[in-house]
Regions:
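Extended, low-polarity transmembrane helix blocks
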Residues: 1-36, 52-59, 63, 70-140
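Perimembrane loop-to-helix junctions flanking transmembrane segments
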Residues: 42-55
Length: 140
């Protein structure tokens, strides 16, 4: 295999699944921090109210991250989470500075574009979506 040739057939879809799982699990931790204070919030942060914008974001992070990690309804979940991260960046990070490295918005941008990629690519081979598609194909 040359570094200039694409990877052999099974690996791109498998690595897409690994990226999806790792992204989903990391995203869940942002939500659990907001909803359950686990891992603990930085000192001096007030508790998050569940029905506030941040609380609803935490709910989306936990349940959307879980669905995304499992590969369940990946495309619609990724669409919602990508939009949420765009809102997060432009509402909370961008007003602080134009530069993402200064305004601490790099994770929001990365999550936004990773999710946007999955809107178009799908979940990959190791996902509930793929299992559902295989079972539907077997019935036909």
């Amino acid at each position: 295999m040359s570094i200039f040739n694409p990877a052999p057939a099974p690996w791109p879809s498998r690595m897409l699944s690994v990226l999806r799982i790792v992204t989903g699990v990391l995203f869940i931790t942002f939500g659990t921090m907001k909803l359950f204070n686990m891992p603990p919030m930085p000192p001096g942060q007030p508790p998050i109210e569940l029905m506030s914008q941040t609380g609803i974001g935490g709910i989306l992070e936990v349940f959307g991250g879980l669905a995304f990690a499992l590969g369940l309804f990946t495309r619609p979940v990724a669409f919602v989470l990508s939009g949420m991260m765009a809102v997060v960046y432009f509402q909370f990070h961008f007003p602080q500075s134009f530069w993402p490295s200064v305004n601490m918005g790099v994770p929001a941008i990365l999550f936004c574009f990773i999710y946007l990629y999955f809107v178009f690519s799908g979940a990959g081979v190791w996902s509930v979506d793929a299992m559902i598609a295989r079972s539907k194909a077997d019935r036909i």
